[in-house]
Structure formats: C-alpha cells, structure tokens
Regions:
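Acidic, proline/glycine-enriched N-terminal capping motif
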Residues: 1-129
Length: 129
C-alpha cells in the first residue's frame, strides 16, 4: 500500500530563521506543512494499521516527485516528511530504532509534485534474534 502526500517537499534544514531566541522553519516548510497536514491526518489510521504488520525498524520507501529540476539531497526533504510522520502519529520516532528509510529514484513532474510513502517488507524481519 502506498500513500501520496502532494506538494513540493522542502528541506526543513535549509532556510531556518533565527528569531533571537530559537530557530523557526522557513516559509516554504511552513506553507508545505499547512497544506500537507490534512493528508497526514486522513491517512493516519490506514498507515498505522499497515505498520502494525511489520517489525521495527520499519523499512519505509520515499519516492519524491519533484516540481523543479533543482539539485537536492534526498535526506533533506526526507527529514521534513519523517518529522511530519512523527508529528501526526504515523511513527513513534524517526530514529534508527523505528525507521529504516529507503529512497526510490526521484521523478520530475512540474504539475504534480509530492512524495509517495510505502512500507516495504524488511528481509531481516524473521532473522532478528
């Protein structure tokens, strides 16, 4: 089963702003999160039900559909998505105990950017002693 979160996924690391007391997310990240939150809420129960069928760490695939041809590092937008997965209760934490991220080759689609999220079978699920 796959879940699609629409929108051009920005990096939560780049563009952070200093308020004088702490860093806040960039406007791009704030706008993305505002638009994506309903999708995370909508798919929450479905994702959790599927996740319950897998041992931890869950092997989770991310396939980014980029709205521009700008170069990017997979880990930066993945961090945004993983932070949202924690925030909206999809996963308990995004550390190595809970998630093993896997990246698919990105796709360019100016009209339909977003990210496909899929829980994969972990070959080691039956070998954890």
């Amino acid at each position: 089963m796959k879940w699609f979160i629409p929108g051009s996924v920005p990096s939560s690391k780049n563009g952070r702003r200093w308020t004088g007391k702490y860093f806040i997310a960039s406007k791009a990240v704030m706008n993305y999160r505002k638009k994506a939150k309903d999708y995370y809420a909508k798919y929450h129960d479905e994702f959790k039900a599927e996740l319950a069928k897998h041992d931890l760490p869950a092997k989770i695939s991310f396939e980014f559909i980029r709205g521009t041809r700008h170069k990017f590092d997979y880990i930066n937008p993945a961090q945004t998505v993983q932070d949202d997965m924690v925030k909206f209760g999809w996963i308990e934490d995004d550390n190595a105990e809970f998630i093993l991220p896997v990246f698919e080759q990105y796709i360019y689609d100016k009209e339909n950017p977003g990210v496909w999220i899929e829980i994969l079978n972990n070959e080691k699920e039956n070998n954890n002693n």
